[in-house]
Amino acid sequence: MLQKSEVVVLTSINQEGYPRPVPMSMVKAEGISTVWMSTGNDSWKTVDFRKNPKGGLCFYAQGDSVCMTGDVEVITDADIKQELWQDWFINHFPGGPTDPNYVILKFEANHATYWIEGKFVHRKV
């Protein structure tokens, strides 16, 4: 189901302690528990995750949904940024894969709640 979702909702905890959900384009997923997204180094969510790596990620497809909690790592590694670079990123990062404002967010789930075919399932990931 995650592979069918181009957009996920990523939630950070803002400076006032409130959840801050934002829609994000998914760049890559490894199974269901690891999701990669790109963003700006100067974005509020990047600031939030540097101060508190706890986050949430949700996605939805055809009436089914998955909501996960986990940790988010801000990745600045040049090789990973190059590997995950997509041509349309140039609209946001004119310097290309080496643009200093381009970073990757890596979400790693530790718990998931599924709503699949009318049934709730909670599990550790």
Residue positions per predicted region:
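A short, Trp-centered hydrophobic/proline-enriched beta-strand micro-motif
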Residues: M1-Q15, G55-C58
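General beta-strand recognition
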Residues: V9, T34-W36, C67, T113
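A short mixed-secondary-structure module that forms the rim of ligand-binding clefts
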Residues: V27-Q62
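Charged, gly/pro-rich active-site loop segments
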Residues: C67-V125
